[in-house]
């Protein structure tokens, strides 16, 4: 790698090597460090392999020149480290100066082997391995170099401590340390003025220099554990152990900031040993710190050896405390510090307080001196008074307990054992201090004893800590967070405790580890999953026998309630009897509960003392749309033996608000809208659903009950996790959670995340983790989604075959009949006028999007005001605001809507649009536009005009009357008459997305003496169920009129076998849902689906668009035909023929 600088920013560029399959695999490019810079320069440097992970290719390299240094260092990262979300694998000295003109001194190779590796004849690539022997040599050299650097660093650190202690005590030039009775170690201090002067001249300038550098940086960083290779002097080499230590690779290393002004006494002691860690797996040139003991140095006896101490990753909250130890070694700062100039990305800063630096050793020593006598640490040399010690220990204890309260210890690799030991040690020290008030006097008597004795003894004697005691439950974070929310906890001042960005390296590793564990757990649970042929017996008390696929589903449901998380998603196709399957589950668990009721000795679930839920119920809470609340009640009453299940409808103004009463019922049924009104949804950042409800939340009765299970019917109603309904549902408490929906994914994978959040499927109920680990568009994310769906979701379709090759459900035949119609001459003339206007509006909109045709002085064409004026209404003329500049997207979509209405009936052009219909179209109108739309239905009737002028063309006014038969209405009536004359008793269902169109059809049905009933949004749930029952009865009405939105879900209209779709919608799943109202379990007759399409109109284009959307939706989730409801510009061009 050569030094290539960006011509724009002047910074040294990174060397990027392609590792993924594609045209750039194996090729290398120089790229600028700045993300927004587009500088790229190709190079012919060959592919390299990582020194730490030999089987992986190095994909990123970078040159960094540490501040006040003349030796460049080359940082490298391989594909494995990048996949783990870390920054660098490590770094090596760059032996040859990449820019000799800029640097006055060229770094020379220190060993012949290294110079051979980087000879000028080879490419400038320190990782290139030509054969196996050379690779082994280079790795060995990398390891040995790290050992020399670590030993060098330890010696300088301890010498610096010795010098600072001498300064504090002002020792004589010739002095000896007395052997302490409580220690077996005898340490001698070097004597002689020459030796002392030599040490002072060696260490003092470096200390001052490092302090100055840290203060200049403001937030200077310290790199510890990075292998480096300066020459060691004779005096330094004396402290190097004879036998080199092997390089230890940690699985993770903390990215530790130094928080300004924080108490350095929060440093976590490591039992007096030195932990030496090399840089691994991409911990960046950032402030990585390995913890060291304070008093390991050349003063120890020869029998003592340097040995590393295994160290578990600490919680993010511990970072700030450990960071201060980085300032105790100024030599590290000088040798390893990387310049924090603005041109160096990947680096973050931390402030070093010079006063903290001076007092750090003393405060850290006091931590070990304050341990109780049982720890084997002598307190003789402690000159501080007991009050100061007590205050010091109390402060540390509060910090540790605060950390414990904020961290989910179960997510830590050591399960929080280290933190618990520290808390126990601090509590013991406080107890010992309270029992020995005369300790301060003893300390004063021995104040003249050299302080180094205590330091040495404290470091040499390992701490014997009392085993951790069990913690009270309220201190433990709920298990659903799994440490992820704790990883983003912030200090009271609002500053993040872990620098390096919102997702720092330790948190990224935590995310990766927890995700892997959760996926592995789900994968292991599949081993106990019942097979496709496994069935469960019909529960006692069920009046009707279950079909085979329902018995198989029941076996799966019972299995899921024994797994974690308890519950899942039942996503069977619409019409396969999901309601009866869930009723069978409730009845089965009810029977099991009766048989085990006497044996149960423990509560159903654990409740904390701060939890407002005081009633544990064995019942089931069912949440459904208001249109289905009576449907559920009727299904239970019809399918289950009387008095088996007690049902309560939590709905209406007279509902019971006593949680204790509700907890006694077997089934409580309520609606989504009622939940959203009753349950407060003010959600704070990082709040766990259902944990510690707010004060106002205690007034909601449904929150005061812990249910045996919650069932969300039509669960796609909570597909948006940010809406009030979704948040309220997630706050409910239950042992098992079920989502029942025929379309688990309607728009995108965010719909699936909403269900994961409701199921509390940790850790995938955390949005940031969901986006980074599942919904990231990668192959690995797709694999994780596949594991989730296999474990948590059961879906069968009507056309699915069982193991024997037979259909899963025996349903009658279904055929679709497409009626192609031609508009009459008058209808075609009106349609063409609207088409020309719509096409012009879209073209001008496209020009504005492209930046070519922005006409600021011209108001856009408002279709509502234009049509209102043409039908004789002058009200819109009094609303100049309606003609002001509006978003063109609204106008284009509204023009498209009017075009589709032209194909159905021209009278729809005069009627106002229902707000729910506008919402389904994706239209959000301003108040002026809504008022303008209302004027369409208020035509002046006092002076009726015989003609209507549209764009200069006059048409007869009777053409727009609702009493006139349009082409589509005429074809519909002809089909209905043919059905009435056909064999047997056949009924029809007519579906339209516009209630105004249903009113026009009803008018003509009445003229033809056909009985009908209408279900739309204005019909209350009780009347709706009565109409459904009447229609399914043989003596009921012949025709049922339903709106696409209000009647598209949850209705069982098996009494009819003909379904007419009057208009086309680009959301095909809405139409499929409507078709499933008649084509479902219980249908005995052959089903015919009638579609009307007017030739040469926008409806033909919509039909093509529907097929495209269906093909895309099938690729999202197997069997899930979820739509994409938004129209793109490409779609609009197709619809308007542009």
From Swiss-Prot:
ATP binds at residues 572-579. A motif (DEAH box) lies at residues 713-716. It holds the Pfam family Zn_ribbon_GRF. It comes from Mus musculus. One of its GO terms (molecular function) is ATP binding. Transmembrane segments: none annotated. Residues 971-1133 form the Helicase C-terminal domain. Residues 135-182, 192-202, 267-280 have a biased composition (Basic and acidic residues). GO terms for cellular component: cytosol; spliceosomal complex. Its main location: cytoplasm. It is found in: Cytoplasm; Nucleus. The modification Phosphoserine is found at residues 436, 859, 884. Keywords: ATP-binding, Cytoplasm, DNA-binding, Helicase, Hydrolase, Metal-binding, mRNA processing, mRNA splicing, Nucleotide-binding, Nucleus, Phosphoprotein, Spliceosome, Transcription, Transcription regulation, Transcription termination, Zinc, Zinc-finger. Residues 104-124, 351-369 have a biased composition (Polar residues). DsDNA-dependent ATPase which acts as a transcription termination factor by coupling ATP hydrolysis with removal of RNA polymerase II from the DNA template. May contribute to mitotic transcription repression. May also be involved in pre-mRNA splicing. Residues 559-762 form the Helicase ATP-binding domain. This is Transcription termination factor 2. Residues 90-396, 846-866 are annotated as: Disordered. Interacts with CDC5L. Part of the spliceosome. The lineage of its organism: Eukaryota, Metazoa, Chordata, Craniata, Vertebrata.
């Amino acid at each position: 790698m050569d030094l290539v600088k960006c011509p724009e920013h002047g910074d040294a560029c990174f060397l990027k090597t392609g590792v993924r399959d594609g045209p750039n695999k194996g090729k290398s490019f120089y790229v600028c460090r700045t993300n927004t810079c587009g500088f790229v320069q190709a190079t012919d440097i060959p592919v390299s392999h990582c020194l730490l992970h030999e089987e992986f290719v190095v994909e990123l390299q970078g040159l960094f020149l540490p501040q006040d240094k003349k030796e460049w260092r080359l940082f490298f990262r391989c594909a494995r480290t990048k996949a783990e979300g870390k920054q660098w694998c490590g770094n090596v000295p760059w032996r040859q100066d990449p820019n000799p003109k800029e640097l006055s001194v060229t770094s020379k190779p220190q060993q012949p082997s290294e110079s051979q590796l980087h000879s000028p004849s080879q490419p400038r690539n320190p990782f290139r391995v030509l054969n196996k022997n050379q690779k082994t040599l280079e790795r060995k050299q990398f390891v040995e170099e790290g050992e020399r650097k670590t030993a060098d660093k330890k010696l300088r650190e301890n010498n610096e401590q010795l010098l600072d202690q001498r300064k504090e005590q002002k020792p004589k030039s010739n002095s000896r340390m007395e052997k302490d009775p409580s220690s077996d170690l005898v340490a001698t201090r070097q004597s002689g003025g020459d030796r002392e002067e030599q040490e002072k001249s060696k260490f003092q300038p470096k200390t001052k220099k490092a302090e100055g550098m840290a203060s200049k940086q403001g937030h200077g960083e310290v790199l510890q554990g990075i292998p480096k290779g300066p020459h060691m002097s004779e005096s330094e080499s004396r402290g190097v152990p004879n036998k080199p230590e092997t390089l230890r690779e940690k699985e993770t290393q903390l990215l530790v900031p130094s928080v300004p002004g924080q108490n350095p006494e929060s440093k976590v002691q490591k039992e007096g040993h030195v932990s030496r860690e090399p840089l691994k797996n991409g911990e960046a040139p950032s402030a990585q710190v390995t913890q060291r003991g304070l008093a390991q140095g050349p003063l120890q006896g020869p029998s003592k050896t340097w040995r590393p101490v295994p160290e578990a990753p600490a919680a993010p909250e511990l970072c700030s405390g450990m960071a201060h130890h980085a300032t105790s070694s100024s030599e590290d700062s000088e040798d390893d510090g990387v310049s924090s100039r603005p041109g160096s990305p990947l680096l973050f800063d931390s402030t070093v307080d010079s006063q903290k630096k001076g007092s750090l050793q003393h405060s850290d020593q006091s931590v070990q001196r304050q341990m109780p006598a049982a720890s084997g640490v002598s307190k003789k040399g402690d000159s501080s008074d007991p009050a100061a010690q007590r205050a010091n220990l109390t402060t540390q204890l509060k910090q540790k307990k605060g950390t414990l309260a904020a961290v989910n210890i179960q997510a830590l690799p050591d399960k929080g054992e280290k933190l618990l030991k520290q808390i126990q040690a601090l509590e013991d020290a406080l107890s010992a201090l309270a029992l020995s008030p005369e300790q301060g006097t003893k300390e004063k008597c021995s104040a003249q004893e050299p302080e180094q004795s205590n330091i040495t003894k404290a470091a040499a004697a390992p701490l014997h800590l009392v085993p951790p005691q069990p913690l009270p439950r309220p201190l433990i974070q709920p298990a659903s967070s799994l440490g992820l929310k704790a990883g983003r906890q912030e200090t009271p001042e609002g500053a993040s405790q872990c620098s390096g960005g919102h997702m720092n390296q330790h948190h990224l590793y935590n995310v990766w580890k927890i995700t892997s564990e959760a996926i592995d757990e789900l994968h292991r649970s599949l081993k106990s999953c019942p097979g496709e042929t496994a069935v469960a017996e019909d529960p006692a008390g069920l009046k009707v026998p279950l079909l085979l696929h329902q018995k198989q589903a029941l076996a799966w449901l019972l299995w899921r309630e024994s797994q974690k998380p308890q519950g899942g998603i039942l996503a069977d196709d619409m019409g396969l009897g999901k309601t009866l399957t869930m009723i069978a589950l409730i009845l089965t668990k009810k029977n099991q509960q009766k048989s085990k009721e006497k044996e149960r000795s423990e509560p159903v679930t654990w409740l904390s003392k701060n939890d407002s839920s005081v009633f544990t119920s064995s019942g089931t809470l069912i949440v459904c749309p208001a249109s289905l609340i009576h449907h559920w009640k009727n299904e239970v009453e019809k399918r289950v033996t009387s008095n088996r299940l007690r049902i309560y409808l939590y709905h209406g103004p007279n509902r019971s608000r006593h949680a204790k009463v509700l907890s006694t019922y077997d089934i409580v049924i309520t609606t989504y809208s009622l939940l959203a009104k009753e349950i407060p949804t003010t959600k704070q950042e990082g709040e766990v659903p259902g944990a510690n409800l707010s004060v106002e939340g205690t007034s909601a009765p449904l929150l005061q009950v812990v249910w045996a299970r919650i069932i969300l019917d039509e669960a796609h109603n909570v597909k948006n996790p940010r809406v009030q309904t979704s948040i309220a549902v997630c706050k409910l408490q239950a042992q098992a959670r079920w989502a029942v929906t025929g379309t688990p994914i309607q728009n995108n994978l965010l719909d699936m995340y909403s269900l994961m959040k409701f199921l509390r499927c940790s850790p995938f109920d955390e949005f940031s983790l969901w986006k980074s680990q599942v919904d990231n568009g990668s192959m690995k994310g797709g694999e994780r989604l596949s594991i989730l769906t296999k474990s948590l979701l059961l879906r069968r379709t009507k056309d699915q075959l069982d193991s024997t090759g037979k259909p899963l459900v025996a349903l009658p035949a279904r055929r679709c009949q497409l009626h192609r119609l031609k508009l009459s001459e008058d209808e075609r003339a009106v349609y063409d006028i609207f088409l020309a206007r719509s096409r012009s509006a879209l073209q001008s909109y496209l020009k504005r999007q492209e930046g070519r045709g922005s006409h600021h002085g011209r108001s856009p064409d408002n279709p509502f005001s234009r049509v209102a004026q043409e039908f004789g209404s002058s009200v819109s003329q009094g609303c100049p605001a309606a003609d002001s500049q509006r978003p063109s997207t609204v106008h284009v979509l509204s023009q498209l809507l009017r075009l589709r209405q032209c194909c159905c009936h021209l009278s729809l052009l005069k009627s106002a649009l229902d707000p729910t219909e506008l919402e389904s179209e994706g239209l959000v109108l301003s108040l002026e536009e809504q008022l303008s739309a209302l004027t369409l239905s208020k035509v002046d009737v006092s002076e009726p005009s015989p003609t209507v002028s549209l764009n200069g063309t006059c048409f007869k006014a009777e053409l727009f009357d609702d009493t006139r038969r349009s082409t589509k209405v005429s074809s519909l009536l002809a089909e209905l008459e043919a059905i009435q004359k056909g064999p047997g008793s056949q009924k029809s269902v007519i579906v339209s997305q516009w209630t105004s169109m249903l009113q026009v059809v009803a008018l003509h049905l009445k003229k033809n003496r056909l009985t009908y009933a209408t279900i739309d949004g204005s019909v209350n749930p009780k009347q709706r169920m009565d109409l459904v029952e009447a229609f399914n009865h043989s003596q009921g009405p012949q025709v049922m009129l339903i709106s696409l939105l209000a009647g598209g879900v949850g209705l069982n209209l098996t009494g009819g076998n003909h379904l007419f779709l009057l208009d086309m919608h680009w959301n095909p799943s809405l139409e499929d849902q409507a078709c499933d109202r008649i084509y479902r379990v219980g249908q005995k007759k052959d089903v015919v689906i009638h579609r009307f399409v007017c030739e040469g109109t926008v409806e033909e284009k919509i039909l093509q668009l529907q097929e495209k959307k269906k093909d895309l939706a099938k690729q999202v989730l197997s069997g899930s035909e979820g739509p994409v409801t938004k129209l793109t510009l490409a779609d609009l061009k197709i619809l308007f023929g542009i």
